[in-house]
A protein has these predicted regions:
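Aromatic-lined, polymer-binding surfaces characteristic
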Residues: 48-56, 60-296
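Non-catalytic carbohydrate-binding regions of carbohydrate-active enzymes
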Residues: 240-257, 280-310, 345-361, 374-376, ...
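Terminal, non-catalytic domain-edge segments
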Residues: 24-37, 41-42, 47-49, 310-375, ...
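Bacterial Sec-dependent N-terminal signal peptides
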Residues: 1-24
């Protein structure tokens, strides 16, 4: 009897061990059907967030690179808490205050990175306890875009959780997960996240495509729900419409919001590729930022598009998306755009260490074709005479499909530049009357009248705009004689299906051409 009991006990122990080993032996991504979409499932190993074990030898070498040492020095400096005198001088504790990454958020990144690369357990322990204490005591809410501050907490916490995983106590893992869920519930998108802004809006920024995705990957083994919610949204609604838009080699949210919106498309690309899922987007994504190469004027400014604040003393910079895209696609032209003003936001500095291609050589765009056409859903063309200080630049727009949000009603418009702006997009995003949904914004700046386009004035025409969003709503906007407001009372497009519908179809480029030489055309 004792032998039987011993045999049965040994058998079950053996089965348990085999099952346990099987659960922990899936080192690579697998793909599963989840409610009608096939999605990547994180490997059951750590690290899997931003880096994998195979990346660590290269990362250790990178730590000796002068540029990486410089970034690390910056992070170490940022890791020092503000002095009481510095805190007293702070006037605004909006999300930008937290994006400065002073104190614990920079400190724990360096500590977790140190453990990841060099194995210093004391650094891991410091990062785990400091970040947990921070997570348990933050509650920013949504006022003033503070969801972005909450997102930084998810991202930093996720790094510590994943990179220091084998140094965490089970009680700490549980506490981290509880904090992630609590913080996510306070964010603008909510938790579970609402799938209502898959093309444009704040949910097409940090919250979903970087912050919640990162936390979900880190905690997947213990709590798969967060990742599952995000990945289903992405593969069902975010990816298909982006891949369609990328085929036009351009972007719809303008020359300012590309820094936050398109950057987060690139973050999700990098995050899932590093996890092991491969490149998830249409490779045409590589050429989106080429539009900004062509928009660049000899004076350093760019021809504006969409919501932007034209300030002559500040040269527009696209360093973050250019760094992410150039490094992923090994694109020397985009590396050139990055090096124009290599200034990565502080909450993204760690990715300059992890992902930037330090060997990629920049190449000026002066051997690119002088005319560039962006096909459906855009129908846009930019033509240049050269790349030097005497360049003439002309832009022509059709707008086949209209997304809205930070996009303007500027179909059929043109801009001209020669030694100065000759025909321009007028107005400013944040003027004396305010910003989004201000009288200036909805009655002039975003409207056709502020652009070089045809107006047909009908005194009886109504421009219903209640769904435009933001504060200061009104039932109607001023009649400018311009283009209709797509969607239900100017509501931002919320799905791929809507984008292709009659409501959001605003034109069609019937033909285009330039030549006879494709690189240096006589006509465009």
């Amino acid at each position: 009897m004792k032998k039987s009991i011993l045999f049965i006990t040994s058998f079950f122990l053996c089965v348990f061990c085999l099952k346990s080993n099987a659960q922990q032996s899936r080192p690579e991504v697998t793909w599963e059907n989840m409610e009608g979409v096939t999605v990547p499932i994180p490997p059951q190993v750590h690290p899997r967030l931003y880096v994998r074990s195979a990346d660590l030898p290269d990362l250790k070498k990178r730590m000796e690179h002068p540029h990486v040492k410089e970034v690390l020095a910056t992070l170490n400096k940022l890791g020092k808490d503000r002095t009481p005198e510095e805190e007293a001088k702070v006037k605004d504790r909006g999300f930008r205050y937290y994006f400065e990454m002073r104190g614990v958020t920079s400190r724990v990144q360096v500590q977790a990175l140190d453990y990841l690369v060099y194995g210093d357990k004391k650094q891991a322990r410091s990062a785990i306890t400091a970040m947990l204490d921070t997570l348990q005591n933050v509650n920013y809410g949504t006022k003033g875009d503070l969801s972005r501050a909450s997102g930084v907490m998810l991202t930093c916490g996720a790094m510590v959780y994943d990179w220091c995983y084998d140094q965490m106590k089970e009680s700490e893992k549980k506490a981290y997960i509880e904090s992630f869920i609590r913080i996510a519930k306070t964010m603008e998108c909510g938790y579970p996240p609402r799938n209502n802004e898959p093309i444009a809006g704040h949910s097409s920024e940090w919250m979903i495509l970087r912050d919640m995705l990162s936390a979900g990957i880190a905690i997947y083994d213990e709590y798969p729900d967060m990742y599952n919610h995000v990945i289903k949204m992405m593969f069902k609604d975010y990816l298909p419409v982006r891949n369609y838009i990328y085929s036009g080699h351009n972007y719809h949210q303008g020359t300012s919001y590309v820094n936050v919106r398109f950057s987060n498309d690139l973050f999700s690309l990098w995050i899932l590729q590093r996890m092991g899922a491969g490149a998830i987007y249409n490779p045409a994504q590589q050429f989106v930022l080429y539009d900004f190469l062509y928009r660049r004027r000899p004076d350093g400014q760019v021809m504006p598009a969409g919501d932007t604040n034209p300030i002559r003393k500040n040269m527009p910079s696209y360093s973050l998306p250019a760094m992410l895209a150039s490094s992923f696609y090994k694109d020397s032209y985009l590396a050139y755009e990055y090096e124009r003003k290599p200034n990565i936001e502080r909450h993204c500095l760690i990715f300059d260490i992890l992902w930037r291609d330090l060997d990629l050589k920049a190449k000026a765009p002066d051997d690119l074709p002088l005319t560039r056409y962006s096909g459906s859903p855009f129908g846009w063309m930019i033509a240049r005479t050269a790349w030097d200080e005497n360049s003439v630049i002309a832009e022509m727009k059709i707008n086949e499909q209209f997304v809205g949000n930070h996009q303007h009603l500027d179909g059929g418009s043109f801009q001209l530049y020669y030694k100065g702006p000759l025909a321009i997009d007028a107005g400013a995003y944040q003027g004396s009357s305010g910003g989004y949904n201000s009288p200036h914004n909805k009655n002039f700046f975003k409207r056709t009248i502020a652009h070089n386009s045809l107006l047909v004035y009908n005194p009886d025409e109504k421009f219903a705009c209640w769904n435009y969003g933001g504060g200061g709503k009104t039932e109607f906007a001023t009649n400018d004689g311009g283009q209709r407001m797509p969607g239900d009372r100017w509501k931002t497009c919320r799905s791929f299906e809507q984008l292709l519908s009659k409501d959001y179809t605003t034109g069609k480029a019937l033909a285009h051409g330039f030549g006879p030489d494709a690189c240096k055309p006589d006509y465009s």
